[in-house]
Design a protein with these regions (language model features):
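Iron-sulfur-associated redox domains of electron-transfer enzymes in respiratory
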Residues: 1-115
């Protein structure tokens, strides 16, 4: 059963492993459910970019931005534990995202009881 639940993930959720994927998922939901809300996103890849982005945020230069930071350039799909080339991982992930039957989660999420 856990396997089938895994495959039912939304397209937005499936894209989390790629740099920019978390922010993109949030932006898609906001655009769908709150179209009048403007979304400003700043994302950083790699520790140096993350540090720079956090410094800018601390200085007040990114006020109102949704900030996403991925420690590995390219995101988790390009991390130290990966065993396939990054371009193949991106291509495979894009296909996995596209094949989701649900692009984004419903506006009203149902409660899930954990055992």
């Amino acid at each position: 059963e856990a396997e089938s639940s895994f495959h039912d993930a939304t397209g937005a959720g499936r894209g989390y492993a790629c740099a920019g994927g978390v922010a993109e998922a949030i932006e898609k939901c906001i655009n769908e459910y709150y179209p009048d809300v403007e979304v400003s996103i700043e994302h950083a890849e790699g520790l140096a970019e993350c540090k720079k982005t956090l410094t800018l945020a601390k200085a007040g230069r990114l006020n109102g931005c949704l900030i996403e930071g991925m420690g590995c350039p390219g995101g988790c799909i390009a991390g130290a534990g990966t065993n396939i080339p990054v371009l193949k991982a991106k291509k495979d992930l894009a296909a996995y995202v596209k094949n989701s039957t649900t692009p984004i989660p419903p506006k009203e999420l149902e409660e899930i009881e954990l055992e």
